[in-house]
Amino acid sequence: MLHDRTFSALSGLSAVQTANVTYTPDTAPGSLIANISVSPAKPYYIQWGIDNTNTAGDLGVETYVTYQDKNIFKGSEIWRIRLGGAYEMVRGAIEKGFDTKNFFEFSVNTSLAFPRVLSPIFNDSYAAKKGKTVFSTGFVWQNRPEFKKRYLTFDWKYMWATRRNRFSHTLDLYNITYTIVPWILPDFQTKYLDVETNALLKQNYTNQFITRTSYTFSYSSASVTASSLMKVKKNAKSSSNFSFMIDISGTLPYTLAHIFDYKQNADKHYEIFGVPFSQYARFDIDYSRTFRLGIHQSLAFHAGAGIASPFLNSDQIPYERRYFAGGPNSVRGWSTRELGPGRYVRKGSADFFNQTGDVKLLAQAELRFHTEGIFEYAIFVDAGNVWTIQEYENQPDGKIVLDELAKDLAASVGAGVRLDLSFILVRLDVGMKGYDPSTREWNITSPQFKRDVTLHFAIGYPF
């Protein structure tokens, strides 16, 4: 155990390229002398890249440059800075009345990571010395034909592991996201944002101030250390994983606003820098279990649930913190954000803002077939949906009703092929709608390929 701890601690330092621990007999009976040797890693890292983009058929190009110092303070601290830029030509922008067809985005992100927990409370514990503290901040400048946005972010995070890495902890001590929308095309505002049924869409194009604190705990039955990693991969047996996350937003700003008697706007909400801050609570829980049925087969199960609720200074959850269903890791008979909430009927091909919810339920089962080569195969069944906790005008039939819960659960079946390249697993899944809660019909009895079949390309297992 001490050998694994030493090897893992040294290998986890960014300034160390390789580490080796050997033993020689000591003069004292029953004792050994540990000889530790390390080789330093290259301290600097520079990467430049350029790539093409395709967003809903709009072609563009993006480029970035990243610089990283792996030992900036001579104690394996990592400083990283990334500069990025993107251009995209929006099809039909001029015909739609936009002044330009160009989309520009510039970004700068920087982070500083320390190989220990910087806290006076836990600083002397083994977990703290093996943990990590990360400070990061970023800015995004975005101009589109229909609007302009600016994002400013800051994050202060602790990460550590215990029980031979079986238990992992992440404390996001304070995360701030400040979003400004300085300009919106009047025609875009009138046609889309001012429509009463587009309340969620409008929320995404308003100034926002989100502060949050979260804690995530995860458990893995496999003890993964540097010396046992390959053994775990090659001789994988039945395993289980469990995690939960608690996310609280807006508590500190609301406390300060209440103490210092900040002024409220017309909606009775406190503001910071003239922007109402979000306030909500969110809880997620997730469990998965894999059973080895033999050398070439395994059966995997997954269940997940989540609930989020606004309170005090907010009436709705911010869009980026809401739940969605469908996609390569969800109910695979639907594409991402095409399912729910509840019995909600999709309006058009771009209704993803309204297809989100405050409650999520998901259950999945997958029978996997492993071969001697690099290919794997699977058949699967998924069930789940998202709901709102209250009836919103723009999301009719989206509210969760316990008596109707079973009828609101969507179901899909499918099959997939996976390419296991050891360092990465490439997955191609084909899902088919089995039961659609929006129509209350079993599509599986008379499937239509275009309507009911969805193709998913992803990296890694779905769970």
Describe the role of every protein-language-model region.
Residues M1-N54, A281, G306:
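Periplasmic polypeptide-binding modules associated with outer-membrane biogenesis and secretion
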Residues P40-K42, N71-F73, R116-L118, W160-T162, ...:
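Outer-membrane beta-barrel strand-turn architecture
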Residues M1, Y45, I94, D99-G304:
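Transmembrane beta-strand segments of outer-membrane beta-barrel domains in Gram-negative
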Residues L32, S298-F380, T388-Q390:
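Extracytoplasmic gating/loop element in the C-terminal half of outer-membrane beta-barrel translocons
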Residues R91-E95, K149, R166-S168, Y254-F260, ...:
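Outer-membrane beta-barrel and related beta-rich outer-membrane complex signature
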Residues L419-F423, K450-F463:
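Outer-membrane beta-barrel "beta-signal"
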Residues S14, T27-P29, A56-G60, K74, ...:
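Transmembrane beta-barrel outer-membrane domains
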Residues T22, Y44-N54, T63-V65, D69, ...:
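Transmembrane beta-strand segments that form the barrel wall of outer-membrane beta-barrel proteins
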